[in-house]
């Protein structure tokens, strides 16, 4: 297996110095020989090295540097003189592209190209320049580089100033390289089947049949009486839920938060001018039902709002326990089940209102939101029409509902109840991988695993991306806490798991954590 990472250990830096010597002293006579057979680059402290491995053997490298002057500036003058102005906003230099002689194959080239482009793109560079040797001109062109200035150097070591622009990457290389990518995102979900129903009207009888079938399936999975299907995101679903609380003027509520999405609910509730208190727990810790019972016992609260599956930490809050408290103290329980709905079987029977979406565990295209209720909502003239739950419960389809979304959801729902077992098995398989012992100590649900990275693994997120393994860690709330998330809901999970397991197996032999 060939795989790439950002160099970070002393052993890697020594291997880089050896390869640097073999390539740029012995093979290409740029520097004087020495007895150590090591060549440390003059910009070593400023370089970021991407290295390529064959299992655990370092076989190739490339260096990035964005501090001026570039070495190519010293050869031809400032590169901006030769490049179009629009590509000069953020330029980096790529140097020291080297691969051991025995490994100069198309597979290694492709792996380095993928890693090089991913790194440059993620860092926001508009162009990457390189001094390419004339003997490897074909190789550089295969990687997307184009000559932009006359050749320079000596007869024995002649170089071509070459550039790879962000525009070339986006319009030529990105799609080709992304074919080998696997994602472990908790949404959106990759679609492998052709999207149909592109010409079906939402006013047709055929559409109505699909709509009713989807409604019944959702109601069966949720064990509720009513569901509104809305074009929108989970945020829209929660707006509709909160709008009901505001329109009904139910009184004071209690909002429970122990993560990012509980906090978002609280902020939305503030915008609706709802009257409520907050029970705030540390991220990743579950709520103490005894303490909540003491609060409800006062009789001060008429409703309670909680996130069932707190995606930011992978915490599954105790829905059964909270439901029992709500019933006992006659409090209306409202639940954000966006992350858990479709991931495991549970009942929303005792929930006054609950929300879910199409593009999470269910595995359908993102774009449809669901609001479940145990009652038939009354029209609320004070609410915006789009956020009035009653409009979605009158039997008619009040607003345009794309058939492509509904048809895709219908097909995804046909996987139930078998999908529950599939996700559980995937979840258990994921737990066996290296580094999963770093998962947060919390109550889990079979949708995603959250690990907290020690300093030694600070590059793991980008290192996985360099190899086409895309995991969830870009959100600010995840970056701030060093969280990395692996979800099990993508259609090609089994194939992705094999590659992830293989890479992590070698990775842990290089990086101790």
Task: Set out the residue ranges of the language-model regions.
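Terminal substrate-recognition subdomain of acyl/acetyltransferases
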Residues: 1-30, 40-46, 57, 97, ...
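Conserved PLP-dependent catalytic core of the aminotransferase class-I/II
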Residues: 213-224, 414-440
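Active-site C-terminal subdomain of aminotransferase-like
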Residues: 359-431
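Conserved beta-loop-alpha segment that forms the PLP phosphate-binding cup at the N-terminus of a helix
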Residues: 224-254, 262-266
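Conserved C-terminal alpha-helix-loop-beta "cap" of PLP-dependent enzymes
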Residues: 442-502
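Conserved acyl-donor/pantetheine-binding loop and adjacent beta-alpha core of acyl/acetyltransferases
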Residues: 61-104, 159
